[in-house]
Structures are given as C-alpha cells and as structure tokens.
Amino acid sequence: MKATEYRRYDAVGLAALIANREISAPEALEAAIRQTEALNPALNAVVHTTYDRARRLAQAALPATPLAGVPFMLKDLGQLWEGVPTTSGSRALLDFIAPLTTTLTSRYLGGGLVILGKTSTPEFGMASVTEPAVYGPTNNPWAPGITAGGSSGGSASVVAAGVVPAAHASDGGGSIRIPSSACGLVGLKPTRGRNPVGPVMSEGWYGLAASHVVTRTVRDSAAFLDLSHGPEAGDPYAAPPPDGPYRQAAQGPHRSLRIGVVEGAMTGDVNLDPECLVAVDRTASLLEELGHRVEPVSTGIGPGPGRRAMLTLSAVDTAWMVGTFDIDVSKLEPANQVVVEAGKAVSATDFADNLYLVRHYGRIMGRIMEDHDVLVTSTLATPPWPHFALQPGAEQRERIAALLEGRYTGSAFQLMEEIATKSMNRIPNTWPFNMTGQPAMSLPIHRAESGHPVGVQFVGRFGREDTLFNLAAQLEEARPWIQDYPFMDPGTTQWAEADRRAQSGRPE
C-alpha cells in the first residue's frame, strides 16, 4: 500500500478496506511503519516503537469491530501497555517499563487496534507545547519550527502528517484541543468520567483530565468513543450514558440548535489574535446559514481565581505523584521542579478552597448551558507559535536556579504562576472546560493567512458529546477539511534547518 493511498483514508475507511479484504491488516501496518520511518526524523513525534508487537497483533485473528486492524499510537503519558516503556516525557522515567496494561489501552487492543508506537509529550504533560528536554521539540507538519501544541503534540503531529489516522491523546487543560487546533485536526475532550482512567488511578488531576484521541474526521472521533467509553469497576463517578452510538449521532439528522458565541477570551483578560476572531466570526455566520440560532454570550468566568485553581490542582497532583512513586526530583526539568515545590507548599485548606472553586465553575456553566445547546469559542488565543516561545526568560531561569539551590526567598507557588503566564495567555478558552467537565471539541475550519490551522472550539452540555458530533459532522460536510494535508517534504533544506535549530537547544 503506497503512502499516497494510505493517507487518503481515515480510520473508519481503512478498517472498512481491511474488513472487506481489499487490503490486509499487515499491509496497513507496514504502510504506517514506512510512514513513521520516513517522517519521524523530521517530526520528532514518536519516542518509542513497538513494531514487533504490532506485527503480531496485525497477523492475529481480528475481532469483528469497526476499527479492527487500524494502525494506532499511544501518547507516552498515562496509558500503560505491559512490558512497554512509558517515560512521560521525563529523564527521570527513561528506565520505566509498564508493569500492567491500563483499562483504556485494553479497550483499544480489544477493539483490534494495532499499536505501533508511543508519541512525545512534555514532561508529565505539564505544558501546552511538546518540547521535552529529554527528546527535544516535536514539529508541526504544517511548518518547520512551529509548535505542534501540547501536551498531546506528538499524537497530533503523526496524525496530521498521515503517519497514522488516529492516536491517543489526553487533556488536563486543553491538551487534546490545543494540538488539534495547531495541527488542523478534530480533537474532542470528552465529558468527565466518559473514558476510564484505571485500574491504578481513579481520576486525573482531581477530575480535570480526560483521555480520547485526535483524528482527521468527525466519524473517526465518534467511532473511537463508541469503542472506549463506559465506566469500570470502582470508578468514583461516571458520565451519563449516551442515548445511542456516537457514530449514529454524527450521521444525523441535524436539528436547529441554540448556540452561544463567546467572541473573545472566556476569562476576559487576553486579547485574541485577529485570525482567531475572524475564525469565530466566520463560524458564527456559517452556523446561521445552516439554520442554527446564534447569539453572543458572556460566561462571567474571570481570570485570576480559575487560573490559580488549575495550577493548584495540577501542582498538588504532580507533587503527590513524585512522592508516591519515588521519582528522582533532581532529574526533572527545572520548571517542573518548581511545580513540585509549589505543590508541596499548598495547605490543605487552600487545596480545598481551589477544588471547591473548580466545582463552582461547573455550576456557573451549567446555568449558562440551560439556555444553550452549544457554546462556540476560538480554541486558542493565537495561531500556532514558534518553538521555545513559552520558555522562561533569563531572569526567570535565574530565580528558578536560586529556588532549587535554596537561595530563593520568594514563593515557589508565585514563581510557578509567573512561569505559567505565557502558556495560560495562549489558552484562555480551553482550561475552563476542564474545570466544568463538559465535552469540548476543536474543529479545523479556519486557516490563517500564513496557512497555519486555526481551530474553533465547540462546547456541549455535560454528557452531550452526541450533540457535538452531530453539529461537527454538519460543519464537516459544509466546509470539508479531509482533503487538507500539510505540505511536508522532510528532505528539503527548510526542514533540515528547522531540525538543526530544534536540536540546538533553547533560545537565549
């Protein structure tokens, strides 16, 4: 199977070819392996390959499932496959081999997916870009030297480049939607509790995080959620069960929806790039053309307390993880050593206050959603940006060093907040819905003048992924994007120069 033919198909289409015996699962896998070997030197997106295991999976009898035989990759964070390395983007875990297989991975394998590798992530997923010190930055297939987003940047890069039609991703503050916007993909963060996180963990980041996939088509995202959703024994909570298959919801019929449009930043403290404003405006016009009732809406979510709550919960969880699993803190990236110190400094009452605020935001949005079926926002505040743009500056790096050497007299938490500001200013519309637990999806329905993708975010009521799939399929039909592939020739001087810059280290 040639690369040009392989890339034409989404996961559902490729699975149909395999089911109809037009191609075999081993043929599809070998096409994916060739794509990986040809493109990953330029993408720097795949950090571990499992070709031998994948060949055994492809050659075995496939289950009679809608995605059987499809090549697939796991994000190198959260999801374990027994006997396979999981580094979580950290030098501290380079020797870690998974002792078990997590429930979600088991569901993927049970559905006949052929897992051939693991994709890059920032250390512990603690960034909106994918630039782990241990592996270097992951390139965006649309342009060398531009971020693929994070923390699921490796997965987004390989899907956008046509290495695999879909890849696992996870989202604690936007980490499915950010790279989907940057790389021109469909990226759904499901409802809190929709997909399992066990058997070891009960929730991620105290309910902020969720797992799903990044894909090129709406029907693929729906098909994967049909495969993976549902609680497991011992879950602390579960999402409301769907009325039927998500693939069926995506196929229509379409109904007129009440849609609220947030024209700027949810938090009101960030000015969006003009390209992002245009994307939302054009989307609102398209929705009206399609017969939906569209009106502007203000959410009333302010910047400061929400950001602090997000950072508090993620820092405390990181500090807990490092201590519980006896991770060598000295091997962490300096900024994440600050996160650990900040998390350790949070008092029990401060933690409880911030957890309460997260739940309170859910109440606020729940009332807003009583009058709307869907909210629309820009996914990001800007089009995708160059590598290292969010790294701490020289003065911040000096204070980080002082903290780690015991010379710093200030607050570790305040230093962490300051370091995070650049990133949080790029994602004012993603993290609020990690707090509320609502399903939120980025769709690739706009291109900047530069040619870079600009995603638009669609947010549903709690538990109503079906509404999002139905609307997304309608938009995909009205403004199809499946034919859009990033121009990428890894043999060009442009890519070689980008790779040289990426490997040379952080800018001054």
Predicted feature descriptions by range:
Residues 1-49, 289-291, 450, 484-508:
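An N-terminal boundary/leader segment
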Residues 22-30, 59, 245, 274-298, ...:
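Acyltransferase
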Residues 54-134:
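Acidic/His- and Gly-rich active-site-bordering loop/insert found
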Residues 67-90, 248-262, 313-366, 379-415, ...:
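Short helix-loop capping/hinge segments that flank enzyme active sites or metal/cofactor-binding pockets
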Residues 100-232, 434, 438-446, 450-455:
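Short glycine/serine-rich loop segments
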Residues 189-283, 301, 478-508:
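A short helix-breaking turn/cap at a secondary-structure junction
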Residues 414-435:
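Alpha-helix-centered segments that form part of catalytic cores
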